Design a protein with these regions (language model features):
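WD40/WD-repeat beta-propeller blade N-cap
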Residues: 116-123, 159-165, 200-207, 248-254, ...
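A conserved positional marker within WD40/Gbeta-like beta-propeller blades
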Residues: 143, 185, 204, 232, ...
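Loop/turn segments within WD40 beta-propeller blades
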Residues: 127-132, 169-174, 211-221, 257-263, ...
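Conserved strand-to-loop turn within each blade of WD40 beta-propeller repeats
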Residues: 137-141, 179-183, 226-230, 267-271, ...
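Short, contiguous acidic and Ser/Thr-rich linear segments
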Residues: 33-48
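Short acidic beta-strand-loop surface patches of small beta-rich interaction domains
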Residues: 34, 65-86
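WD40-repeat beta-propellers
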Residues: 126, 138, 144-147, 168, ...
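A structural motif specific to WD40 beta-propellers
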Residues: 111-114, 153-156, 195-198, 242-245, ...
Length: 484
């Protein structure tokens, strides 16, 4: 018996973990601003009830959906249950951090609605147009193919490359496509006709990456950047097909390029570095060092907004160029969320770094946990999450602002090659060497759907900007479209 008590010890232990009837909470935004007074709420308050309380405090005309976090753990059940599970002390006012969610909801893709043969070698790259109406695919058969998403049928076969088409990128205004090949050439295409606009030559080895200047900086889109095995980065004018600048401070192959929204170009290389360039002058601003092996992949926190320009999740954009540019500016600023642009890098050294490259050459965080090389990193469209795909067959989820670890997703039985997010940031899809696609849910940290169907390795995946379709391609030469 416990001293001074008529209760046996096991009953005392139960009393110690009893939930308080009420909890004092303080709402705080994800940038640290306190909202409203401290509130006395019942311990069984739900996330939906917290949402109603917060909308009342914010006095907004439109009631918005929110996610709530305590100590960076999302509340997905009654508050008291969440606090007990996570051993959170409530001796002082509890800081409840809120984040707005997308006002629209993407439904998970669940079935293959089209298997589109046509390529005669492996499909190496797929990308949806910013307006979500077309899909472009690049293949080892040297062609770019365009597909109509309304009818799920082939539109055009674009010929020009003399070797594998390694990368495909739509301009953010949906008016052009650039492809980079194993032959070292860059081809520009008119997606309306499938005709070549012209060829850009200058690289001496194969093209590893291409990226367009964002629409909020220039419309119509004219400039794009390419990276190559020849160690250089080149900026091109799409209308004249001339090389405007050639930047060469990397000592080994360039593996990835990104054109940021604040006037910088980012490049990663097998020389273990990430370089930050001034996009107007081609001057090296700073070099980000820390990786111990090849840097394979880069991702930008505002990438979804940069890729889609003036096109929102309904696939609509103003027809007037000035209005379109203004909308692209608004979408980029909203994606930034009042913070500097963040960059993530993933490497053969099994680690990732999170950077604020416009302000510092020191990383915000070093992210460890993968047991093999990292193939790809990708920010969610709202910039709050970061996922990494690895040869260790796992996917890891990280906080996109702080770089802290959130979850590991296991289910693939082969290396994970690529990942793509749904437009509402609630799900992502992965493609693997094991021939499957898998849809994962962020809130539950679990597998949502398994999508078998490919006969061999899945090299490339993309989720349409409107959220309605997923495209995948790989070694079996067949392009597949997946829908709800």
């Amino acid at each position: 018996m416990a001293r001074g008590s008529g209760e046996p010890p096991h009953k005392m232990a139960k009393l110690d973990t009893a939930q308080p009837t009420n909890v004092i909470i303080q709402f705080q935004s994800d940038v640290g601003e306190t909202v409203g007074p401290q509130l006395d709420v019942p311990h069984d308050v739900t996330p939906k009830q917290l949402e109603t309380l917060l909308n009342g405090l914010l006095k907004q005309e439109e009631k918005l959906p929110y996610s709530f976090f305590v100590n960076e753990q999302q509340i997905s059940e009654e508050l008291g249950t969440h606090l007990l599970k996570n051993k959170v002390s409530v001796e002082t006012a509890l800081r409840v951090v809120y984040q707005p969610q997308a006002v629209f909801r993407v439904r998970p893709v669940s079935r293959c609605t089209a298997s589109m043969p046509g390529h005669t070698e492996a499909v190496l790259a797929v990308q949806f147009s910013p307006d979500g109406r077309q899909l472009a695919s690049g293949s080892g058969d040297t062609t770019l193919r365009l597909w109509d998403l309304g009818t799920q049928t082939p539109l055009r076969t674009c010929k020009g490359h003399r070797s594998w088409v390694l990368c495909v990128s739509w301009s953010p205004d949906a008016q052009m496509i650039v492809t980079g090949g194993m032959d070292g050439a860059l081809w520009l295409w008119d997606p309306k006709t499938g005709n070549p606009i012209g060829c850009c030559k200058g690289h001496t080895k194969w093209i590893t990456a291409v990226a367009w200047e964002p629409a909020h900086m220039a419309l119509p889109c004219r400039r794009f950047v390419s990276g190559s095995k020849d160690t250089t980065i080149k900026v091109w004018d799409a209308q004249t097909r001339r090389c405007l600048m050639s930047m060469s401070s990397h000592t080994l192959a360039v593996t990835s390029v990104r054109w940021g929204g604040d006037g910088h170009i980012y490049s990663s290389s097998r020389d273990c570095s990430v370089n930050v360039w001034d996009a107007q002058e081609g001057r090296l601003v700073r070099s980000l060092k820390g990786h111990g092996h090849w840097v394979n992949t880069l991702a930008l926190s505002a990438e979804y907004a940069l890729r889609t320009g003036a096109y929102d999740h309904t696939a609509s954009a103003p027809s007037d160029p000035k209005e379109a540019q203004s909308k692209a500016v608004q979408r980029y600023e909203a994606a930034r969320g009042g913070r500097p642009e963040r960059l993530a890098s993933g490497s053969d050294d099994f680690t990732m770094f999170l950077w604020e490259p416009s302000t510092s050459s020191k990383p915000i965080a070093r992210m460890t946990g993968h047991l093999q090389l990292i193939n790809q990193v990708q920010f969610s469209p709202d910039g709050r999450w970061l996922v990494s795909a690895s040869f260790d067959k796992s996917i890891k989820l990280w906080d996109g602002v702080k770089g802290t670890f959130a979850a590991t997703f296991r289910g693939h039985v082969g290396p994970v090659y690529q990942i793509a997010w749904s437009a509402d940031s609630r799900m992502f899809v992965s493609g693997s060497k094991d021939s499957t696609l898998k849809v994962w849910e962020v809130a539950s940290k679990k597998l949502k759907l398994d999508l078998p169907g490919h006969a061999d390795e899945v090299f490339t995946v993309d989720w349409s900007p409107d959220g309605g379709s997923v495209a995948s391609g790989g070694k079996d030469q067949v392009l597949r479209i997946w829908r709800q």
